[in-house]
């Protein structure tokens, strides 16, 4: 006969509902409190052969239990109860014997046996929950010494009758909570134990023993106690008040059963105490009259004495209410700002966001631990050096004042003092963490600030501005994004395994003289192709995915007479293909050869197609023939890559035409996604002339500016040079902070590898 996990005796759940013991010194006789009963069958009912084994280590298995319990007799079955989802052990099991006699012997001999270093607790299994929760014969013991464990408690109470279950409540670390339960087979045995043990000393501690009271009954009785309290708590008591004076303050309200002041180990008053009255009316009168009454320059607090768990519950409710109120108050008005430079402080942050509304608070988060890296001797040396420098400056200034008439030095000294004081203030603060918070007075102001300040360049770094979110909200959003990403990966894996996948817009390469469009690294703005363009190969190239061989293809996949190309597909114009198509130059396989080669021995351009891919220029590319930007490792003239035509026609310099002919009218006429592309193509050759290695990086940084500013930079060479220098300084500082190797000339660490990674990602997209 096997038992389910649902037959867990209530003793396991008892710990969660156990009340806190009263720590009030002046409290009356303690209440009889206990937890859910763990009743077993009565003496008149025959025992089954099923045993409950509790207090097990999570690593205990059925095999370990079988090895132990089979020594008593023949075991029918053993089951360790586990969580339905995680399959982790719940810490208890059921052992079924073939006969009841073996079960009785196991209960007597194996109870509290060490299994994996923990004493197990064995009792008869009771499948009927009604019998488990009657509470008959269940005894609650509190104020136990921490040294008393399950076995010691069992040995103490075994003299009064047959014990079905015995347990000392423990915390998560295995330490005693100071109370426990003993479940007798009969109610007479329980009454006998209460009569003899209640009030006795166990390990020099007076214990309370009483009948088990269910949680429901305890709750109703607790509400009744709150309404008819007699114990009063007083705080803010002057330390000079004696026990006699304290008692005299409250004697006028009625008969006092006990009054005490709490004191520390040295005997000094801790400023609070308890007074227990004989009647509720006296206690209520004391609270009404003495609360907030001034005694010896201190206002007393007088109220009903509360138990620890009751105070904790009230504090938790207050904290939760305050948290919800705060969350609703700042909903939609608190902004999170990151990517701040180290020199931005609270005042500067307020200045940045001040134009967009009324700021109630602005805070830059800083490290709280300020480590001093200098010894006191080095500090003194530094002070001496600064003093000598100041003396030298003063002497030089005095000499200059004698020779020429200058402005009074007072104003300069005041400015220096102000600067020094500001520096001293900043030294007292920790290092900026690079992010902060700005709180506005209304949601409209906050949304306006997000719109205007997000991605705004401040001190060479683009700000990230968004509405502040709670940690749990951010975590849930992150989990959702990770789950979506995993779903995409699974779909990609399924597609790679041969499952059909939807048609996607391929990358677009334009012929000579046409405005170029670069798809983004993770996807671009797709628009209908135009005459003269070439399409990159459709991913996959499997049969049925729009194969499109050219005439003369050999070995390529053919296209049936009824097959059609996708509606947005246009092949290479035959006029652009001069000469025969090479073997295997079908679509999509042959189209891969249209792209530039990846190395000195890679594929070159298709014969007869001069300057193919001129539109593919932009940040991250080097300079190739005819002014066309070339990726790192791309073929250059004379490298002799396979498929390159030696008699290729010379290419013009379309960049100069774009830069010279780009006007505000032409820019505004273009679609918004294409405007930055046009500006980037016009800026790139100018920036490359100044910084060949970092032209792509700097172009991308400058494209964060407004379009009107970029147009003015195209016309003003000096302004462009200044912006390039500024971007270069920002990039150098970024590389230093990142730990990369950056030289004073502005060369980035390993630019070739960065360019190679960029090129591979773009071609993947």
UniProtKB/Swiss-Prot annotation:
Residues 377-427, 749-765 have a biased composition (Basic and acidic residues). It comes from the Eukaryota. It is found in: Cytoplasm; Nucleus. PROSITE patterns: PABC, RRM. Residues 1-49, 364-427, 619-657, 737-765 are annotated as: Disordered. Belongs to the polyadenylate-binding protein type-1 family. This is Polyadenylate-binding protein, cytoplasmic and nuclear. It comes from Aspergillus oryzae (strain ATCC 42149 / RIB 40) (Yellow koji mold). The gene is pab1.
